[in-house]
Amino acid sequence: MDAILNFLRSTGFAQLFTGENWKCLVMIIIACVLLYLGIVKKFEPLLLVPIAIGMLMTNLPGANMFHEILYAGGEIHWSLFGGAPVTAEFLAELEAAGVSADVLSSVTVGQSISIGLVDILYLGIKLGIYPCLIFLGVGAMTDFGPLIANPKSLLLGAAAQLGIFMTFVGCRVLLHFTGAEAASVGIIGGADGPTAIFVTAMLAPALLGPIAVSAYSYMALVPVIQPPIMKALTTKKERQIEMKPLRTVSKREKILFPIVVMIFVSLLVPSAAPLICCLMLGNLLKECGVADRLSKTAQNELMNIVTIFLGVSVGATATGATFLSPKTLGILLMGVVAFGFGTAGGVLLAKLMNLFLKEKINPLIGAAGVSAVPMAARVAQKVGQQENPGNFLLMHAMGPNVAGVIGSAIAAGVLISLFG
């Protein structure tokens, strides 16, 4: 009988209703909501489904698949990975560094941690491996031809990064976030999930869960968030502007472009080099014509495997102690602000450029400067055709869209160099 009682006490069901474990129950419900959004509503399912499963894995009492203490204080504690026992001095250092009481109370002095599955997977995020590999795959799937054919669209991609810096200011002034936390929230405005994860893992790892969920949720809502802003900032006449077809881009230009960008951007913003180099390597594999096997692997098998690991690892950071806080609400709110300012920045710069250009550009393509590829470009096409059914803006919008990918990586490098 005692054996049965001991077994029942050891189950997750019994632990679920003891102490602070009610937070785990709330997080399990949130994970199920995300699964519903990903599977039924199809909101970024390739990321939301793994993220939700990661949430479930880390919030199941007794499963011990992820230990926050291994990464507490923003560092990797390799000695604990090697089986070293937790010491009183170690806990005192973490407490002085501001690590939450929930994390500190998860271990006891003298305890050796049994490394879990997600503990190992999370190393890929902490070391910056997964976001870079995602960028490798993105580069292999991206056609920079529209940007090369219309270099002016690079300015629109840069203007759309306004959302990042306006949100940074808002978080600092209104929500009193630290510089590193504000930078991590601001990067949501780039509409680039891997970049947001890359920056947050370096600057504010405690916020990784809510920021990743916010970034990918709002990316899925681009067709809902952008059109009202685009219509509010443009006139009917502006939305009807037709643009001439883009010139044909030569193979030589497509091969030289990733090489030149890799060198120039890496020298300009060294902190952005890992993301930019992987992005341009993937694109060079696609365009050079002699590495088709590598290009296809980067686009398919590698991208899919890394996406699973990335999603599960990010979801695992969303424990009740970190996710169920006022900061999460602030992050969700500022995420919308970031997307709004990013959209507005691109549209307003396009309108400004039209004051000086003989061949006018449709301001709607400025909204595609956020790097949600190709969703933002499709939104510009759809809104443009609502006003003028014969208008085809998709290829023109792809220029700012892919420029936004480069722009968000550069912005990430700037923020890391300032607050890293």
Role assignments for model-derived ranges:
Residues 1-20, 64-134, 201:
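Interfacial loop/helix-cap signal at membrane boundaries in integral membrane proteins
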Residues 34, 57, 124-148, 283-285, ...:
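Hydrophobic transmembrane alpha-helices of secondary-active transporters
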Residues 40-48, 66-67, 120-121, 141-156, ...:
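Interfacial helix-loop-helix linkers and transmembrane-helix boundary segments
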Residues 127, 135-141, 156-166, 177-206, ...:
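Alpha-helical membrane segments and immediately flanking helix-loop junctions
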Residues 147-168, 321-346, 397-401:
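Entry/N-cap segments of selected transmembrane alpha helices
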Residues 206-224, 334-342, 365-368:
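Alpha-helical transmembrane segments
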Residues 214-290:
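Membrane-embedded hairpin module used as a gating/binding unit in multi-pass transport
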Residues 262-346:
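Transmembrane helical segments that form the transport core of multi-pass membrane transport proteins
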